Amino acid sequence: MWAVNSGSIYMIGYVPIEAIQQEYRIRVQKMEMAAKDAQRIFMKLKAGEASLPQEVKEKLETAYEKYLSARDWYLTDLSSGFHDPEGFNRTVSVVTWELRKTNAAAQGALKKTPVKQ
């Protein structure tokens, strides 16, 4: 009689699918948190609560656009998504790193606009 361990069936290479799914969730969460930080900065700029030098603002916009592209590519049916974990990990790591770097630069350069009464 055949005994089947269902956990061993769902593997990619030598890595269990659960490990890949967990890594996927963590990377998506980190990328989304970095994007939320950028969104908060954009909200302050739009509300007129703060200002940024043009160069820093352009870098932040570029990093955010890369986030949107990566999100729309990997988190929808446009790509092979979950079936390309190496490509996903590489892309999301770069996008998250760039967002964090530009968020930190923007936070450092953020100038509060005086409140008009």
Residue map of PLM features:
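Primarily the internal scaffold of c-type cytochrome electron-transfer domains
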Residues: 1-113
